[in-house]
């Protein structure tokens, strides 16, 4: 965990030097924690000191999104998840993350255009 934490601190320093208005990271702090929680079966990872510490890395003006989909759609789209022993645990952790007040939930059951519009409404 400590190595991932340090790696993310370095990544944050790189991001803060950029001059663009938005930086989009597909996988970052929450994904690292959920991967760790799923692989090590740490059910309370999102309520842990590590969650709090990792979130100190995130700049204060950051929007955090979680894109949700129906579990059957995910399993049909990525068949490897059907045999992944961590999948259900990871899926449950993402659902827990979606209930956090600092996370914006994007419903991805419709078109990609619909998902993009949901994000734009939040950041504008």
Predicted regions and their residues:
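ATP-dependent small-molecule kinase phosphotransfer cores
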Residues: 1-41, 45
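A generic local structural motif
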Residues: 9-12, 50-54, 91-92
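Structural motif
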Residues: 15, 56-57
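Short, well-ordered alpha-helix to beta-strand connector turns
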Residues: 19-20, 61, 101
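Short, surface-exposed loop/helix-turn segments at secondary-structure junctions
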Residues: 39-49, 79-85
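NTP-dependent small-molecule kinase module
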Residues: 72-124
